[in-house]
Amino acid sequence: MEGTITLTPIMTDILTVTMNPALDVSTSTDRVMDTHKLRCTAANLHPGGGGINVARVVHRLGGDCLAMFPVGGVTGQLLQQLLMEEQVPHHCIHIVGETRESFSVRESSTGRDFRFVLPGPDMVQPEWEACLAYVGALPTPPRYLVVSGSLPPGVPTDFCARLAEVAQAASKGSTRVVVDTSGAALVAALDAGVYLVKPSLRELRDLTGRTLTSETEWREAAQQLIHEGQAQVVALSLGEDGALLVTADQALRAKGVAVKVASSIGAGDSFVGGMIWALSQSDDLEQAFRYGMASGAA
């Protein structure tokens, strides 16, 4: 079956798009060793993928959010069921390929996480075009469009840029586009221009071609993206060292929050979810930054 689209009169403050969703499977074992048969704990299943994780956080915070994503096969059905159990509003574009799985194994003796990420299904042009069409045909454009996660095989690297252009055209420029992706997809999205981008330090180094060894250089590199019209806000993720929020006229630094780490998986998505939820309530960027940091540490 080719990608399908079912339009419903949905109004939402925040629309998330996840082109490569996943059924996240997590477990733990005492020690990870090659060639050995490892006895693991019972698996935990969660709906996954960048935008889906963002939507789950927004929903838990009481925000108005809709998650849109392509879905296929038995794995896709299970992912949908898990979202329904959480009562997260969502819309699926049905595709022929099987939704991927991602695996996380925690080594309980050391606290290390081992993550295994599959590429995702091959999507054909009518399927990914249906995703563009859904966003462009919404009766009321969202205030925020969050495009997060990787792109599966078959989807062009400029998809995020195309999606941003569709959203801007439909909303006459009022929708704020937020992008959290990497590689060529990130470059193309920034060339189109977005409201907010959340790169990691490694991604910012790749974007600027600089080593960026100090906070001053981090800030200057982020401001370079802003001055070139690629983004209005840069939320630089620094991992356990916190984050840096940069606009044309201010820079805010937050140190990492000291918490007992149960799992680092999804922390970046939680940061985005908390921040965009706060921005949907108020345009106070400093307050939104605080919410993002708190959500990422939770």
Task: Locate predicted features.
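Short, conserved phosphate/pyrophosphate- and ester-handling motifs at nucleotide-, phospho-/glycolipid
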Residues: V58, S200, G268
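Hydrophobic anchor at the start of a short beta-strand
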Residues: I14, D64-L66, H90, V177, ...
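Conserved N-terminal subdomain of the carbohydrate kinase-like
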Residues: H36, R60-Y144
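Conserved phosphate-binding/catalytic region of the ribokinase-like
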Residues: V187, E215-A298
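Short beta-strands and strand-loop turn motifs
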Residues: R115-V117, P142-S150, D180, K198-E203
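Conserved phosphate/ATP/ADP-binding segment of small-molecule kinases
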Residues: T157-A251
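Short beta-strand scaffold segments in enzyme catalytic cores
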Residues: R56, F103-V105, G242-L245
